[in-house]
């Protein structure tokens, strides 16, 4: 169970990081 929870938290972390990068990319692309 702890392995699954770790994977779930990690995937959430990756999604958040990817979202930040995407926002920065959009800002740089639009300006």
Swiss-Prot record:
Cellular compartments per GO CC: extracellular region
Major subcellular location class: secreted
UniProt source species: Huso dauricus
Gene3D superfamilies for this protein: 6.10.250.590
Family: Belongs to the glucagon family.
The protein's name: Glucagon-3
Functional description taken from the UniProt entry: Glucagon plays a key role in glucose metabolism and homeostasis. Regulates blood glucose by increasing gluconeogenesis and decreasing glycolysis.
Record's keyword terms, sorted: Hormone, Secreted
Coiled-coil zones: none
GO molecular function: hormone activity
Domain of life: Eukaryota
